[in-house]
């Protein structure tokens, strides 16, 4: 049974927002370790990612959700469902927006979704390092007119500006509760999931156009070498929807796939603390984003959310 220390705060914080506002960058900065995929391409977070930050007097469990948008296929339906489900039974909702972008239809969509909600909502204005300070007041006013936020906090997740102030404020809205996770645990996701995300991140960085949204990764094997315990063999398959996409991911004479492997291997070695032999394959699974069976096979399961 978990013990609750008097005055100790703990709770769950959902991070929501339009695609590409910096939610994963924020989470990785706060946790101090890469656990959420980062890319300049929208819709890169597909599953909710839980990051755990433990201090002497609080434990904050962050849930990074897919960027909220109106879905165009079954995968989009899944991503929106994950985002909505994280709003249930959390203690605080962080609505993150991009200071460089005006309040748009995507933000209105989220504000409508929050209507009638009783959970405290923080408006977190990210990327303030990219605008002139004089612009900030106008941004704040445009959102204040549409929703009664518990707190409005401008930050730069990339540079770290004002992030500590946000982290100091959040526990004030959390209930007293137990320490759910050990102090040194930063995520509840298994290594297999993080390896999957690291490989997909490298593909996103190195490809273009429709390729990113058509990609899934299946981890086929993670096995420690029996003769050399410091070496781990990882085998994974990159799934695409069309033969033309397969050619792009492989690249001329296999150059792009090799670069994906090199970059992913370095991050996986840092994660596991061991030498890694990474074996990558590319396979076509036509129209997988619109087939529920393929979504489940590739790790997108409704019952886990």
From Swiss-Prot:
Residues 9-176 form the Era-type G domain. The keyword Aminoacyl-tRNA synthetase does not apply. It is found in: Cytoplasm; Cell membrane. It is a peripheral membrane protein. Residues 126-129 are annotated as: G4. GTP binds at residues 17-24, 64-68, 126-129. This is GTPase Era. The lineage of its organism: Bacteria, Bacillati, Bacillota, Bacilli, Bacillales. The gene is era.
């Amino acid at each position: 049974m978990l013990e609750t220390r008097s005055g100790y705060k703990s709770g769950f914080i959902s991070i929501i927002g339009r695609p590409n506002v910096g939610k994963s960058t924020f989470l990785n900065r706060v946790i101090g370790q890469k656990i959420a995929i980062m890319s300049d391409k929208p819709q890169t977070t597909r599953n909710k990612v839980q990051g755990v930050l433990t201090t002497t007097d609080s434990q904050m469990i962050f849930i990074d959700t897919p960027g909220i948008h109106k879905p165009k296929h079954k995968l989009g339906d899944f991503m929106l469902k994950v985002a909505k489900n994280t709003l249930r039974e959390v203690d605080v909702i962080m609505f993150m927006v991009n200071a460089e972008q005006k309040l748009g239809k995507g933000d209105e969509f989220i504000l409508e979704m929050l209507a009638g909600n009783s959970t405290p909502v923080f408006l977190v204005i990210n990327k303030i390092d990219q605008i002139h300070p004089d612009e900030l007041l106008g941004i704040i006013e445009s959102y204040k007119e549409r929703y009664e936020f518990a707190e409005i906090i401008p930050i730069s997740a990339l540079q770290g500006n004002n992030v500590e102030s946000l982290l100091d404020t959040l526990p004030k809205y959390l209930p007293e509760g137990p320490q759910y996770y050990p102090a040194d645990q930063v995520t509840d996701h298994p290594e297999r999931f993080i390896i999957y995300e690291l490989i997909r991140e490298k593909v996103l960085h190195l490809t273009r156009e429709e390729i990113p949204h058509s990609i899934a990764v299946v981890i086929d094997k993670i096995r420690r070498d029996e003769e050399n315990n410091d070496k781990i063999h990882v085998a994974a398959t990159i799934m695409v929807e069309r033969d033309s996409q397969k050619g792009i991911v492989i690249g001329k004479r296999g150059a792009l796939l090799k670069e994906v492997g090199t970059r992913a291997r370095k991050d996986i070695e840092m994660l596991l603390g061991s030498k890694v032999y990474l074996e990558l394959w590319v396979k076509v699974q036509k129209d997988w984003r619109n087939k529920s069976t393929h979504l489940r096979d590739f790790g997108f399961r409704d019952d886990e959310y």
